[in-house]
């Protein structure tokens, strides 16, 4: 009561404005816009409009669009792309010298494996001849499994640094990345890296680039990304050689479609036209989108609309990667940066890579960009939670990772042995392995992954065609005989580069894997480029590991889709007491059946607990048994209390035990623990 009286006296003594503001406060709060995001995010978005521009933003706003340069670094695995990116960031003052290694390799799996998995971007400011230039760098993956990342990166680039290791020369993925960049019309700058190595032969590497790619090597730059030697010569070359616009040829049929740019990269005065290049998930901000602005400009608070979904969003924050997320008040035409919406996207599927956005009200004035062609999954696995209660957590984790990697396909499926799970499609086995690592590291998911398999094409006798990715959908024996005309499997054209001394072993390996030789070239007296057409099923069966073993680690491999070819394809099943275990079934070529069948039954026997009755483990194709193992039952000693001379009683007890086992085997279910499947399916 005393407290209430004191408050009343204070209010009566206070200025009228104070009391009025206090009485109005609930009304203001009740009618304020409600944003479902963190208070930190709201404070950040509100302060963007009021706080003065930072020195960085003042420098960027003073740079005209003609002084923008967007470029990427493409090369074979381990040729030094990420290390060179570090040196360029240090040279432009974006990071402190020696402050970090592989700054743009942000994922744990990238640092563990020492490879780039995700294309990462960073903006830099570089002063050349007294003028500031805004440079946008993309560090791309080198492995063939992540070529979709490389392809998407070209959408925001006008040129590329083609990097070659001076000690190794041109490798398989150097060739693949060159043709991909060349097809998109990118301006290519030859760069020879690791010239400080004792084994470096920069002149030989230059000669290879000149002969293989017909590049003008007079302007090639010799650098050592590790020591920083000559790195300062790269950026002036980028500014002089790479235009502020990109050319995308009209007849290109690569993964990227046309972006039809033959004029400067954009006009700030036109209505907003924005391309969604990538996206990822943040636990506080939700879905964050990496975008390229083609026309117009975008600020926090504006409302935009998606051409793909028709959904409208309010922009919560815009910024650039410098190298981490750095908020800005505006993104202009020609820039690449990030945005997130407030409120955010409700579902990860709303962020469609290749989608075009514009301001609400300008939909009819803006022509949407063509976007990206979806890459085709080539390798499929089934994923199940170790604990069935964690299915929803696994689903959320997969959806968040797919937001960051749209080349993965996801379908729900169920197994009698392992319960509810997912059928996942990937571009290759390394792609699959990296995804599995990210699920475990970033989301703490405990999962069971089946061995990788490839799709097959069923041609029915009525002329219809069907692509099968799951063994559960493979036709049964009767259907195969009566309704199926032909079964085809996918082939790839593999390009292998290696020293000439290993030629015999490599040819032997390819022939053993049902390969057909297409060409053989010597691009130096000691280096060979060998092209083979191989079944994709053989390629995913650790072909690269066998190739490395045959060449002592000196070989490199690249591949592309070739064609479907007829093959003797069957479904191999594992039977436990004549009941099929659906989680283990695989679609394989008949030549692999005996080896895999024996391997399966031997390995599965090690992980099945003994029962009170005999457990028979078999590998079968249709009704034909390929291999068999038996798990002996526990045996009770029924003769323990019997006198040695009572032969008839002895015989009677043994017969009774035998009959009991027969009945138990007929009605008893084999209990197979989850951990048995986990151990069996482990690599």
UniProtKB/Swiss-Prot annotation:
Keywords: GTP-binding, Hydrolase, Membrane, Mitochondrion, Mitochondrion inner membrane, Nucleotide-binding, Protein biosynthesis, Transit peptide. One of its GO terms (biological process) is positive regulation of translation. GO terms for molecular function: GTP binding; GTPase activity; mitochondrial ribosome binding. Residues 66-250 form the tr-type G domain. It catalyses: GTP + H2O = GDP + phosphate + H(+). Its main location: mitochondrion. It is a peripheral membrane protein. It is found in: Mitochondrion inner membrane. Its EC number is 3.6.5.-. It comes from the Eukaryota. The keyword Ion transport does not apply. Residues 1-43 form a transit peptide. One of its GO terms (cellular component) is mitochondrial matrix. GTP binds at residues 75-82, 139-143, 193-196. Belongs to the TRAFAC class translation factor GTPase superfamily. Classic translation factor GTPase family. LepA subfamily. Promotes mitochondrial protein synthesis. May act as a fidelity factor of the translation reaction, by catalyzing a one-codon backward translocation of tRNAs on improperly translocated ribosomes. Binds to mitochondrial ribosomes in a GTP-dependent manner. PANTHER family: TRANSLATION FACTOR GUF1, MITOCHONDRIAL, TRANSLATION FACTOR GUF1-RELATED. HAMAP family: LepA. This is Translation factor guf1, mitochondrial. It comes from Aspergillus fumigatus (strain ATCC MYA-4609 / CBS 101355 / FGSC A1100 / Af293) (Neosartorya fumigata).
């Amino acid at each position: 009561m005393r407290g209430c009286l004191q408050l009343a006296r204070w209010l009566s003594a206070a200025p009228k404005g104070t009391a009025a503001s206090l009485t109005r406060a609930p009304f203001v709060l009740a009618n304020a816009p409600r944003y479902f995001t963190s208070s930190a995010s709201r404070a950040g978005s509100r302060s963007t409009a009021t706080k003065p521009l930072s020195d960085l933003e003042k420098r960027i706003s003073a740079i005209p669009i003609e002084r923008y340069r967007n470029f990427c670094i493409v090369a074979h695995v381990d040729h030094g792309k990420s290390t060179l990116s570090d040196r360029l960031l240090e040279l432009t003052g974006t990071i402190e010298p020696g402050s970090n290694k592989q700054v743009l390799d942000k994922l744990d799996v990238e640092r563990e494996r020492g490879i780039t998995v995700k294309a990462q971007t960073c903006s830099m400011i570089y002063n050349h001849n007294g003028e500031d230039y805004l440079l946008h760098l993309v560090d791309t993956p080198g492995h063939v499994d992540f070529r979709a990342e490389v392809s998407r990166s070209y959408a925001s680039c006008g040129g590329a640094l083609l990097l070659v290791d001076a000690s190794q020369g041109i490798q398989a993925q150097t060739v693949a990345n060159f043709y991909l960049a060349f097809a998109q019309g990118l301006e290519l700058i030859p760069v020879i890296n690791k010239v400080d190595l004792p084994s470096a032969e920069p002149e030989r590497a230059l000669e290879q680039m000149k002969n293989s790619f017909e590049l003008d090597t007079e302007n090639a730059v010799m650098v050592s990304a590790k020591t920083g030697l000559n790195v300062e010569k790269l950026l002036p070359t980028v500014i002089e050689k790479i235009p502020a616009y990109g050319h995308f040829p009209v007849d290109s049929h690569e993964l990227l479609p046309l972006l039809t740019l033959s004029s400067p990269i954009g006009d700030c005065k036109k209505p907003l036209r924005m391309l969604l290049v990538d996206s990822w998930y943040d636990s506080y901000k939700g879905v964050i989108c990496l975008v390229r602005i083609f026309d117009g400009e975008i600020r926090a608070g504006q409302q935009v609309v998606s051409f793909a979904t028709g959904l409208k969003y309010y922009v919560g924050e815009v910024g650039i990667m410098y190298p981490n997320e750095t908020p800005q008040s505006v993104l202009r035409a020609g820039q690449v940066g990030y945005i997130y919406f407030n409120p955010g996207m409700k579902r990860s599927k709303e962020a469609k890579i290749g989608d075009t956005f514009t301001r609400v009200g300008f939909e009819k004035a803006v022509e949407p960009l063509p976007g990206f062609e979806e890459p085709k999954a080539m390798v499929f696995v089934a994923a199940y939670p170790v604990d069935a209660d964690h299915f929803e957590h696994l689903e959320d984790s997969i959806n968040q990772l797919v937001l960051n990697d749209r080349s993965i396909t996801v379908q729900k499926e169920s197994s009698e042995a392992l319960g509810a799970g997912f059928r996942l499609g990937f571009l290759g086995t390394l792609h699959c392995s990296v995804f599995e690592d990210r699920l475990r590291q970033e989301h703490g998911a405990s999962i069971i992954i089946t061995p990788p398999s490839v799709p097959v094409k069923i041609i029915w006798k009525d002329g219809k065609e069907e692509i099968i990715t799951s063994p559960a959908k493979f036709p049964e024996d009767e259907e195969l005989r009566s309704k199926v005309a032909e079964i085809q499997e996918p082939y790839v054209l593999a390009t292998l580069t290696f020293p000439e001394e290993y030629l015999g072993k490599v040819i032997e390996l390819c022939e053993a894997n049902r390969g057909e030789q297409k060409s053989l070239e010597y691009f130096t007296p000691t280096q060979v480029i060998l092209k083979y057409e191989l079944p994709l099923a053989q390629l995913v069966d650790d072909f690269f590991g066998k190739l490395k073993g045959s060449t002592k680690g000196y070989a490199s491999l690249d591949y592309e889709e070739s064609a479907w070819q007829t093959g003797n394809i069957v479904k191999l099943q594992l039977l436990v007491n004549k009941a099929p275990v659906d989680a283990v079934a695989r679609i394989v070529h008949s030549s692999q059946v005996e080896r895999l069948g024996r391997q399966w039954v031997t390995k599965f026997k090690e992980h099945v607990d003994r029962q009170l009755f005999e457990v028979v483990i078999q590998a079968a194709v249709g009704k034909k048994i390929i291999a068999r193992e038996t798990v002996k039952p526990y045996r009770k000693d029924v003769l323990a209390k019997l006198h040695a001379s009572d032969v008839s009683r002895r015989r009677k007890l043994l017969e009774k035990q035998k009959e009991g086992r027969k009945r138990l085997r007929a009605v008893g279910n084999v209990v197979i623990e989850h951990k048995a499947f986990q151990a069996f399916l482990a690599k």
